[in-house]
């Protein structure tokens, strides 16, 4: 199955309608507060979205930062934080490309956001970045699930929310494909905003879910230099092999020395970082953006990619050979 996913699912209208239409409710901050208490501060929430549970954890005085790939969702988070009088530090990046100056005792995802990474290569790069941002002795919490098919009876049936001024918000499952061999399910969702004047804004996005078996994810984590300490059910009990919802607690392997040949991508990581930078430039966040990423191909060390949309002729890609 070939998937052409937009740069980020949660942009524009989707970001606007996500919170009112979400079916899972607001994440309970308690499990994540307990994880931070056990693993230590500072902490980092990956895929923090519009601020749940990040802002609740910050309101408790915990040293927690956030990271998300959607600038639109982060903008909404900042507005909420300002309204609530909560100071918060957030970073705009994908997980697999993050290069932060700080290291953390605790890194976590509040829900199975990791399933949104579309393939094993991207997941490996994300785990590699998680390991690189953990302090020695720190821990990461990665919830995962194996999705079921969307019931046929729900296709074409909208989930709705009506605001006080009569505006109607809708999300509808339009179609779905599932590839068990690739562990990939793609559901096309239609988001609609219907104003009280009858005007309609509409967008369709592919919701890509890539799932992992427990054994497969364990191997992937170990390839990225992480050790599995526990695999738990949502209720905190040890996961059984046939469970479809589980969370991995990972710690950095102190003896791990990353081989140059692990997960070779022929520069794919660098290109992913470049495309992320290009997205930001196109949407006007930075007229000129420089992205530095690691190239995994043999014989390559680091590369500089500089994109200048004001003068494309000045854009450049420089690859440095290993010393």
Predicted regions and their residues:
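Conserved class I S-adenosyl-L-methionine
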Residues: 1-41, 52
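Class I SAM-dependent methyltransferase "Motif I" SAM/SAH-binding loop
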Residues: 47-49
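Class I SAM-dependent methyltransferase SAM/SAH-binding core
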Residues: 52-97
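A short acidic, Gly/Pro-enriched loop at the edge of an enzyme's catalytic core
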Residues: 99-106
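A short glycine-rich, Lys/Arg-flanked "PGG" loop and its adjoining helix->strand segment in the class I
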Residues: 124-136
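SAM-dependent methyltransferase
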Residues: 141-215
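C-terminal lobe and adjacent flexible extensions of AdoMet/dcAdoMet transferase-like proteins
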Residues: 208-252
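Intrinsic, low-complexity terminal and presequence regions
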Residues: 253-276, 280-323
